[in-house]
Amino acid sequence: MADADEYSTAPTQQEITPLQTTATIINAISGECITTNVDFFVSLDKFKQFIARKWKIPPDQLLILLPYGNKLKPSMFKELLINRSFTLNDFYVYDRRLFSLVSKPTSTNLLTSKDSNPMNSPNSNDLTETLEYLIKNSHISQYQGSDTIMIKPMPSPLEDADVDLSRLNYHSVTSLLTTNLGWLSALEIDVHYFKSLIPDIIAHIKRIFDGLTVCSQYLKLYCFDVESLYNSNVQFLNQLVDNGMTSKWEKCFNDTLSKLTALEGDSLQKFINIESLLENEKSVKILNHSINGKLNKIKREIDENASFRDIITVNIDRLRQIFTPNESKFELEDQMAESFEVLVSEMRTRSRNVLDKEEEEFNSQEFLKSMNVMLEKDKKESVKTLFTISQALYSQIGELIDLKKSLQKHAVAILGNIAFTQMEILGIKRLLLNECNKDLELYKKYEVEFAQVEDLPLIYGLYLIEKYRRLSWFRQILSFISNFNQDLELFKQNELRTRNKWVKNFGSIATVFCEDLLSSSDFKRLNEYHSHTSPPNEDEEDENENSIANYRQDLVKVSQAIDNYMTQIKETDVSEPIIDLLSKTLFETKRFHIIYSNFKNNNNNSSNGNSISPEGSIALKSDDVVKGYKTRIKKLESLLHEFQYSDIGHWPQGVLNTHLKPFRGSATSINKKKFLGASVLLEPANISEVNIDSVSQANNHQIQELESNVDDLLHQLQLLKEENNRKSMQISEIGKKISDLEVEKTAYRETLTNLNQELARLTNEEQSHRTEIFTLNASFKKQLNDIISQDNEKIEKLTGDYYDVSKSRERLQMDLDESNKKHEQEVNLLKADIERLGKQIVTSEKSDAETNSSSMEKGEKFETIPLAEDTGRENQISAYTQTLQDRIFDIISTNIFILENIGLLLTFDNNNNIQIRRVKGLKKGTAQSNILDESTQMLDAHDNSLIKSPVFQKLKDEYELIKSVANGSEKDTQQSIFLGNITQLYDNKLYEVAVIRRFKDIETLAKKLTKENKIKRTLLERFQREKVTLRNFQIGDLALFLPTRENVNSVGSMSSSTSSLSSSFSSVDLSTPPPLDAMSIQSSPSVIHSNVINQASISGRDKNKLMRPWAAFTAFEESTRYFLKDEKGLTKGKEWFVGRIVTLEHFVADSPSNNPFRLPKGSVWFQVTAVVVSYQGV
């Protein structure tokens, strides 16, 4: 059965074995995640150290939250390690430094677009710079250096190649296809890389949102604790106010305490300090007002803090709406990637098939024509399609990375809002704990003092009852001591008789091992233990009886005082529960009696005079009854021990079992029960038979009870033994399991040690890589600073030009406004002069008529003189009017020309009303003509043919008509029409409004162009960092490194190799993978030369295993070569790689030592070293 049990429990143990606890660690700002096993870490500190090494966050700056906002504590982590029942295995990691940008959350910084600034404050520039610094120095983004990792796809060399039939031959076709295959492989790698980045960045963005949500939940939990603390304070204050005695204690003091008398006859008011209570009442009123004011203020602050949390939640939701990428948008990219794979496969297959052809097949014109068709098709269709797809994916990745960076900035800003909200709620918590709690404790202290006034009647009544109980207890103790002395004396006498009887029966034999059988040392010790060294005499008994009598008198006195007190308290306003409690306590106290065992009940019925009355034994309390049962149990245990001692069979070996047994032959049939009553056999003859029978009957009854108890105990003992055996078996099984677990624990420890060592090694490697990256970043930063300084100079120059243009525009505007004012003033003056002249003409005509009618003779006499004067005056007015008209027309022409020069045309609408509208290309004709004055760029006063305005043409026609018409009514009519049209133009403010609006548009356009220029400058910097250089290499340039191609015509011939190295397009071979180990170019060219000579001497069978040098791809430079100096085995296992040039060493092939690659004499070549940025494995 044991084996069956083992087999049945084995599957159960296998089922309950917990799985390993895995955890996902998420960087809440960068979106990165790590999956690890929590069992690798023995404590939370080790767990934090692992995260700190991974993300370069100091352990003291780490904040780890669980998915529902709980902070990870050592106790939680320990529970996860021990129980493995923790279901929340996602850990969100925050850098506390990112919470340092503390800002108040307001509704003004709600986001509306992806490009909006997360900081909308007067110091937004400083805050933005701080934000950039925090993000830069916290290692929060996996793609922080993505600008250097992302390589922009470059066009195929096939696009610029000449694929005419006349230029096609074996070498040109194979070189072109080989180079294009290299470009195709590089493009395919880039596309696969871009495609894999899209879901990763989308997942990072989603995790950033989850991190913000978890942090907001953490804030809500923190604030919930503070709100609970506030609610508890308010509830406590309400309880104090509702149950307080501030306004009730005086009534109790005057109405109740004055009617109750104490033992001395005074009222209970003497126990109350009335002055202190009055002072406390004033303090309570002031304190209540202060606490209410503080709590109301805290309530407003809590509500404001809740509004902050709502704003943060709204901001997070708005961010989720704005920055969540639309995954349906990337379905097109998936289709493009599929078509890309098909095109790449087809194009590579066609190129491989051509490269597999022999050189003789290229002599056929039909084959060359087919090559021409294939290359033309690839050049016009396939290459462009592939390049377009790669460009689309590249731009998509760039947008996603920019989107993530912008989201990170907004996320850090929201963390600052969360930090502000938490600091505010922390201040509220401190206020509640420090000030409000102290005030409430003081309030409670005062209320307790007030409540003592109302509780005083109850407490004083309980005091009187307790005093009565103590007197009763002491009286009963005195009675008990008196009875106990009598019982003790009786015990001693009975024991002496028993000992004498035993000595008489067994003393002669017992002297063998006991000489002094009549020793009374135990009686001496008993006397020393007891306070009385001798039996009490009659005088002491009389004193005890007197003391008892005195205590009885005191009891009667206190009992009367209690009855009077109960009568008084019933007449007051004390509540009924208090009166009932006092009555019940008094009733129980009067029935209080001490329970003790009276020996005389079993030995001497005649000495039962001082026993407890039957009425007293009935009124025992429940606690006293329990104590009585315990006493009976102890008595039964002592009787059981006496019974076992009396039974000879229970004695140990050697006692009454030797040859000295005196009753061996004569007492074989002695019953145990009878032997238990040996005292009966040993009783002196003077003991009455009645007492013996009573004791024997009592003992027999007790023996029967004890025998049944012994049987029960033996049965229980047997059950306990079985249970003990079963427990022992379980303990042994558990011990085996523990030993197995210890072995497993040791194995786990060894595994963990090995893993920690491996982790340390990987950490060191990562640190070395980071050091290299830091070096590269330093060089990149230097180049970037140079570019930025150049761009800043250009920006300053453009800004200065823009400032000059703005000043010129303002100056022209001021001049224009002044000229307009002058023109208006002149027009008004001319109008006034015209009216004045008209009135003078009318007046003169009237005077002339009167003069002619009154004196014809006098008129005839002086007819020549007035006519001459009128004619001169009219000619003068006419000339002045003509000058004024010319001046007005010149002003209007100039204004209209200014409008057209800034692109505005003065024309008519459909209702024949004058309007000014924007017309593109209007000022081109003006700019191309030579009529403008070179100094002012204004219209010549004598030529207005460039003005295209129909309104101006109409005014011009009217002006010409006025000039052509002679003086008279018709001319006056034309002048009125001319002035009316001019008035219509200037009265409606069309000219001023149009010019001001146009300059505002120009200013807006200038700002827009400045912003676009900044964006283009950023793109230019980005493209500058990402471009792959194809000629004139410098330190820091990106270059494509490929293995050189050897096309050996015959064994041992290096001619084709030399020609291969000398060719620009055939200097690399992408059709076949490189050998296992790339050629290691040493620092000295002579060593390179010796390697080449040694390679030439190798047999043809081993020539395919030669190590070929690598060179930088130079498609547009035929005179210079760039060979890789490979000291660290960079090319091992690579088909090609893109590297950044670190060093350049110049050589001229003028001697064999400087020409290890057999280049044409006088050729210039460089020896370069590089670091790998991207590569394609074999």
Swiss-Prot record:
GO cellular component: Atg1/ULK1 kinase complex; phagophore assembly site membrane; vacuolar membrane
Recorded coiled-coil stretches: 538-572, 696-846
GO terms for MF: molecular adaptor activity; protein kinase binding
Modification note: Acetylated by the NuA4 histone acetyltransferase (HAT) complex.
Keyword hit for Transport: yes
Membrane topology annotation: Peripheral membrane protein
Keyword Acetylation: yes
Keywords tagged on the record: Acetylation, Autophagy, Coiled coil, Membrane, Protein transport, Transport, Vacuole
Cross-referenced InterPro entries: ATG11, Atg11_C, ATG17-like_dom
GO biological process, one term: protein transport
Disulfide bonds: none
Subcellular location: Preautophagosomal structure membrane; Vacuole membrane
Superkingdom of this protein's organism: Eukaryota
UniProt record similarity statement: Belongs to the ATG11 family.
Complex formation: Homodimer and potential homooligomers. Interacts with ATG1 kinase and the ATG19 and ATG34 cargo protein transporters. Interacts with ATG9, ATG17, ATG20, ATG30, ATG32, ATG36 and YPT1.
Protein function: Involved in cytoplasm to vacuole transport (Cvt), pexophagy, mitophagy and nucleophagy. Recruits mitochondria for their selective degradation via autophagy (mitophagy) during starvation, through its interaction with ATG32. Works as scaffold proteins that recruit ATG proteins to the pre-autophagosome (PAS), the site of vesicle/autophagosome formation. Required for ATG9 anterograde transport from the mitochondria to the PAS. Also recruits the ATG19-prAPE1 complex to the PAS. Required for the Cvt vesicles completion. Plays a significant role in life span extension.
Record protein name field: Autophagy-related protein 11
Lineage: Eukaryota, Fungi, Dikarya, Ascomycota, Saccharomycotina
Gene that this polypeptide is encoded by: ATG11
